[in-house]
Design a protein with these regions (language model features):
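Alpha-helical transmembrane segments and their immediate juxtamembrane cytosolic regions
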Residues: 1-222
């Protein structure tokens, strides 16, 4: 969450022309974005594995899924006002909503080795298979595109299902579960709030930063 916040703050500074950076082509920024999304989905997969192990009810799953989907729709609407030509139609929350269903009702029933293997297949497949059919806004969510669509955020099922499957597999390892249950160090304990309220933080951090930068520009501080 901290890394994501710093990344988005730099993106916002670029949006307000405070710094000049190419967030769409510069490897320094594109690799960071890929790493942040990968960690986000890895943690989502780990969380889903924990929820299943604890016997999460269907009601609680669908309530959480509804929250994710509602936030995804808000992101689409908000991005349409800010970037009408490149609004977000299938970003990280849209992808997560669909992937959570796939993992919950399908892939979670597979053995751990299969999760590792299918995760690798999901990551590799777009490098070998692509077709213009998947280049439209109604089909690019699959991920087998021949070119990246014009959008501010794009997290299709392929390859991004891979990290979520790996997260699910990772939490089946006893040593990992034991390590995750250790008490947090006092210095990082306050950061756990972001983890417990991850969706709320994700939705609020950008409006807060954008509002602060707009206010700073209004008062001539930028």
């Amino acid at each position: 969450m901290v890394w994501m916040t710093v990344f988005h703050f730099c993106f916002d500074l670029s949006y307000f022309k405070v710094i000049v950076e190419d967030f769409y082509r510069d490897p320094f920024w594109t690799w960071q974005r890929s790493s942040i999304v990968s960690l986000f989905l890895l943690c989502a997969g780990m969380g889903q594995a924990v929820a299943l192990a604890q016997g999460q009810t269907a009601y609680r799953f669908w309530r959480r899924w509804g929250q994710v989907m509602a936030c995804a729709l808000l992101v689409s609407i908000g991005s349409w006002f800010m970037y009408p030509r490149s609004f977000i139609s299938f970003g990280v929350l849209h992808g997560m909503a669909l992937m959570l269903i796939l993992v919950r009702f399908g892939f979670s029933r597979l053995p751990t080795a299969a999760l590792w293997g299918l995760g690798a297949v999901a990551v590799a497949l777009p490098f070998f298979i692509a077709h213009p059919f998947f280049d439209t806004r109604t089909t690019n969510w699959v991920g087998l595109v021949t070119r990246k669509p014009l959008t501010e955020d794009f997290v299709p099922i392929l390859p991004w299902l891979g990290p979520m499957l790996w997260g699910c597999a990772l939490m089946r390892i006893e040593a990992v579960r034991a390590w995750m249950q250790r008490p947090l160090l006092p210095g990082v304990r306050p950061l756990s709030v972001m983890g417990r309220w991850s969706l709320s933080y994700y939705m609020l951090h950008q409006p807060v930063m954008l509002g602060a930068l707009m206010a700073a520009r209004h008062f001539g501080w930028l």
